[in-house]
């Protein structure tokens, strides 16, 4: 199953957009939720974030290989390693790993938990990569970013059971516009990952 047309366009380009270029839709989203005067469905507290679960068997310590790869190649590997896109607050992202520990004794578990378990089974020092991005935002803003990234990657490439939900003006965007924004977010997330380096969480570190 191919990725979205918007991601394929980036994969086939010679270089990615400069970090200096502002994304208009991202700025619109930021401005819309920055000083909201009405009570939002998920609350107005800026305590949410987005997160990605990545498979280290795909990234292969990507940040240590950036001198041998183009940024476009890095994006292809990064996107190929993502198996779950989420939104939450507190320890929501870490809770998936705890759930996987509990799923060891069950006969059946979700695709997401099974992939976490498969990563841990690979070898003793292999762990899940948990990347937090776009932090300190309200719930509806985080939900919209989640939906955009899922749209760009495509549900068949993920263990997410459903597509996300957009709020505000983004709820009226075309699918193409949403996917284009999601591709921008994935580039931003990849750049964070390359700067921070790869940190894996093993089953004994839960």
Task: Set out the residue ranges of the language-model regions.
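Structure-specific nucleic-acid interaction/processing domains
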Residues: 4, 8-206
